[in-house]
Amino acid sequence: MPELPEVETLKNSLKDKLIGLIIKNIELKRDNLRYNLSPLLTTEILNTNILNVRRRAKYLIIDFGNYYSLVIHLGMSGRFTVQPANYKIQKHDHVIFDLNNCEKLIFNDTRRFGMVYSFKTNFLEEKFFYNLGIEPLSDLLTLEYLKSKLITRTIAIKNLIMDNKIIVGVGNLYASESLHLARIHPHKLGRNLKDDEIENLIKSIREVLTKAITAGGTTLKNFVNGDSKPGYFTQQLRVYGREGQKCFNCSSTILKTKNSGRSTFYCKTCQYT
């Protein structure tokens, strides 16, 4: 599933292309993705300038001059790309936005877990995003904040940093990578972390996410940016997907465990409990 670095990469690839343009028409190739499209995707976003392209958590947001916003969630396999006027519609292209420069914005989603909404902009923070946690790359992620969230829960640290009500956008892959960099065992209870471990974890989360954004995100299967280019952070993965291979730090074997359908990768030597 695309996480914060992938959506940030998508935002960066689309921002300069879209600001100032106008959506002239919306074509739906099916009635629903995760939810029905017609009541959630309205015509208020037509014929008004695009003012901004931004990200909140794993949502891509396109703001319009009439105080409406288009909100996209890529789900498991979504792609949101700019295509030329002569583009031929593909099998899983579900929503087509015609732009006033004759290009097209295409939402493609093989597994159909993605979402495309339009709302009044002020509705987003008040109702839609109100229960989301803080952005991990912001100054709000501090020792005091994270410690206050850990101390009241008897949950493994990996699950805690993946909780979008605490920190947004740190999915399974980036949680595994961040914990390896911080040398913290993923199954260690969050409440048992010392202050220096929490500070090191915050630093590691930021470092991993920043490197992933610089590399254009991680493409394991479906992800591409707005120019249809894949991400290359895959080449920098230290533990994720490397079960049975040697740890780059100590040459111990990378282990894999599974919990609630999620795989966790770690080094038992570097990441002690």
Curated annotation (Swiss-Prot):
Its cofactor is Zn(2+). Its EC number is 3.2.2.23, 4.2.99.18. It comes from the Bacteria. Keywords: DNA damage, DNA repair, DNA-binding, Glycosidase, Hydrolase, Lyase, Metal-binding, Multifunctional enzyme, Zinc, Zinc-finger. The keyword DNA repair applies. Involved in base excision repair of DNA damaged by oxidation or by mutagenic agents. Acts as a DNA glycosylase that recognizes and removes damaged bases. Has a preference for oxidized purines, such as 7,8-dihydro-8-oxoguanine (8-oxoG). Has AP (apurinic/apyrimidinic) lyase activity and introduces nicks in the DNA strand. Cleaves the DNA backbone by beta-delta elimination to generate a single-strand break at the site of the removed base with both 3'- and 5'-phosphates. This is Formamidopyrimidine-DNA glycosylase. It comes from Rickettsia canadensis (strain McKiel). The gene is mutM.
